[in-house]
Amino acid sequence: MIGKFKEMKKLIILGQLVPLCTYCGKRITNPDDFTMDHKLPISRGGQTVSSNLTPACMHCNQEKGMLTSDEYMAVLNYRKSKQRS
């Protein structure tokens, strides 16, 4: 899994891959801002397997912390709804 992550970072550097953050939708063009987030955090029983990983920008990954992907998306959706009202 680590080898695949390094390969993805290399493709970002070369401009051949521009992943989107799963959470905020931001295009990740800087390899230093690219992370693979655990949808179910390791601290909550998640594993480092492809089915439990998703691209995320550094900000979202750090802010998400120990939340699951679904929990963090609920937080983001709540914030968006509060901004509209």
What role is predicted for each listed range?
Residues M1-M8, R27, L76-S85:
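A boundary/linker detector
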Residues M1-Y23:
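Short, charged surface segments at domain edges that flank catalytic/cofactor-binding sites
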Residues G15-Q16, P31, T48-N52:
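Flanking scaffold residues of small Cys/His-coordinated metal-binding clusters
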Residues P19, F34, P55:
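Cys/His-enriched microdomains
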Residues Y23-C24, H59:
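Short, cysteine/histidine-rich loop/knuckle motifs that typically chelate Zn2+
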Residues N30-P31, E63-L67:
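Short, non-ligating residues that shape and space the ligands of small metal-coordination modules
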Residues T35-P41:
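Histidine-centered catalytic micro-motifs used for acid/base chemistry in nuclease
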Residues R44-E63:
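Short beta-strand-alpha-helix junction that forms the catalytic/metal-binding core
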